[in-house]
């Protein structure tokens, strides 16, 4: 029995895609039933002059409260690919905490992110192999892969330089967009005019400047995933963005209302939310 338990922890029985509830930030975990792991962003506290409801007065990082306990509870000890979509604090702020707790085989970043000297300095302190991703690169997952669609040029490491990943996993197409906004969406559509995605991780936490009408009309998603902090000061997701989803009958799941969003399955996905 002990041996069976060890096999189950190392090689989970189901495939998984989880949008972890990290407050106002992003962190998405993928694991195949073979044990392959990809983590897209790690979240991180955004510092404001006035505390928001979702912020704690302690110095505990968001990762220590949510992401790290979640991964440990799932029996994760190694992350094959840690993709840092861009350099905003709410996506990479808890990098050091995550690196202390898990073996990271490779950190993947955009070329533009490496133009930020402060970010490069942090990467050097972690001492993990760093690989730059460009459009066309692929990361293996679930007998398929996550394909890098964007960026296609060296940017500035900001929102519209976010790494965008697309994967057809268990028959469903997922698009993970980082903090991509309208300008980046337009470039993506120009490069991939027939791109469709059944599940869209909404860019920039559902901000007004992301998930444009043209983008949604081309992708034609049936489900939008929004990662945002409860009562966050930016008022993400924006009401206008939510209305754009509703007008197109796109179901919305959001971490600030629903908690973590998890897909699991062998050959077909089922989904659940966990607070």
Question: Model-found features: residue ranges?
Answer:
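Non-globular, low-confidence helical/coil segments that flank catalytic cores
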Residues: 1-275
């Amino acid at each position: 029995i002990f041996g069976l338990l060890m096999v189950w922890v190392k090689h989970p029985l189901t495939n998984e895609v989880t949008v972890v509830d990290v407050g106002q930030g992003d962190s998405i975990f993928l694991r195949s039933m073979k044990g392959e792991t990809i983590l897209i962003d790690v979240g991180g506290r955004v510092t404001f002059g006035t505390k928001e409801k979702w912020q704690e007065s302690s110095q505990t990082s968001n990762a220590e409260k949510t992401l790290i306990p979640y991964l440990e509870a799932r029996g994760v000890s190694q992350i094959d690919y840690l993709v840092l979509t861009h350099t905003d604090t709410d996506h990479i702020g808890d990098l050091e905490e995550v690196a202390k707790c898990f073996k990271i085989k490779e950190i993947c970043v955009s070329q533009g992110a490496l133009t930020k000297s402060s970010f490069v300095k942090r990467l050097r302190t972690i001492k993990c192999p760093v690989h730059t991703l460009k459009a066309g690169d692929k990361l293996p997952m679930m007998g398929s892969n996550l394909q890098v669609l964007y960026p296609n040029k060296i940017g500035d490491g900001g929102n519209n330089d976010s790494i965008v990943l697309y994967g057809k996993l268990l028959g469903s197409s997922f698009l993970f967009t980082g903090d991509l906004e309208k300008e980046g969406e337009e470039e993506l559509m120009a490069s991939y005019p027939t791109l469709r995605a059944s599940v869209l991780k909404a860019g920039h936490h559902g901000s007004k400047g992301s998930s444009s009408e043209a983008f949604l009309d081309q992708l034609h998603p049936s489900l939008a995933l929004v990662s945002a902090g409860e009562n966050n000061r930016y008022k993400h997701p924006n009401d206008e963005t939510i209305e754009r989803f509703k007008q197109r009958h796109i179901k919305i799941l959001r971490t600030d209302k629903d908690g973590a969003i998890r897909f699991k399955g062998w050959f077909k996905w089922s989904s659940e939310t966990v607070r």
